[in-house]
């Protein structure tokens, strides 16, 4: 929990009252690899801050194929934000891909913090801006870059995650097959 408080304090001043409120609404959870936090179709009212480990969000198409939208590593947030903000069932599943520790927040109570403690709003606004920019870049990268270029960006964005994530998740995130991922890695090794 202290990681999150320190992260907030490194960017914004935080009153002791706001800090105490965060402690009162947050719950630290230890999770096992394979554990599901959000399941597609469920009502979503939780958001998670990762302090250790790695998680991913994904959807499943009509043919049963998984498409990984996001990996979340230390100091990242993850949830199905579209479901929360539109008050609709989850379109994503969020699962642990390694043993992890997260800080769980009730999304409504997290939103209430802005009303009670306006100094917290810039921190969360920055997080949302980073999330939107990240997704925007991801869409553009999928449309404009080669598989090798996307793979190189993936390695920059998620250093060392390859050691913890199965190849089929990485291929899914990059929008390629596992065979294509093997070819991309072989090309990279030749350079």
Please report, for each region that a protein language model flagged, where it lies by residue.
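Residues that recognize and position ribonucleotide moieties
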Residues: 29, 48, 70, 95, ...
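Cyclic nucleotide-binding regulatory domains
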Residues: 36-96
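Cyclic nucleotide-binding regulatory module and flanking cytosolic helices
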Residues: 1-28, 83
């Amino acid at each position: 929990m202290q990681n999150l408080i320190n992260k907030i304090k490194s960017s914004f001043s935080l009153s002791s009252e706001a800090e105490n409120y965060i402690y009162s609404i947050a719950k630290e959870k230890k999770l096992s690899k394979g554990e599901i936090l959000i399941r597609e179709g469920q009502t979503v009212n939780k958001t998670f801050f990762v302090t250790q480990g790695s998680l991913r969000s994904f959807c499943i198409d009509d043919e049963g194929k998984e498409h990984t939208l996001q990996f979340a590593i230390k100091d990242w947030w993850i949830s199905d934000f579209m479901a929360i903000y539109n008050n609709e069932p989850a379109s994503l599943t969020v699962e642990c891909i390694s043993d992890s520790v997260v800080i769980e927040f009730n999304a409504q109570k997290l939103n209430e913090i802005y009303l009670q403690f306006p100094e917290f709003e810039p921190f969360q606004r920055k997080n949302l801006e980073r999330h939107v920019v990240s997704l925007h870049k991801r869409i553009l990268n999928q449309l404009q870059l080669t598989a090798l270029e996307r793979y190189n960006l993936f390695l920059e964005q998620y250093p060392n995650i390859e050691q913890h994530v199965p190849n089929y998740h990485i291929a899914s995130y990059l929008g390629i097959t596992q065979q294509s991922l093997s070819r991309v890695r072989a090309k990279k090794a030749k350079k």
